[in-house]
Amino acid sequence: MSFMKHSIKVSFQEGEVVIEANRDGLRRISEISAKLASLTDSEARTPANHFHFIEGMKNVETGSLPLVITLKDA
């Protein structure tokens, strides 16, 4: 398994949330989204139903806004 150096920056510009990412960053967001989409209904009712992109987790660029991707209960 190779180490991916992803770059993700989340900002708010002119009334819009903007996510800027390199290819590895976009793949990371896609992987997280795919994993959330594959949760079972019972897993979706647990804390496993979301993922944080925040500076404290070192998974976004410095100065980024926090981003949470959540599986909405269907």
Protein language model annotation of sequence segments:
Residues M1-A74:
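Positively charged, low-complexity terminal tracts
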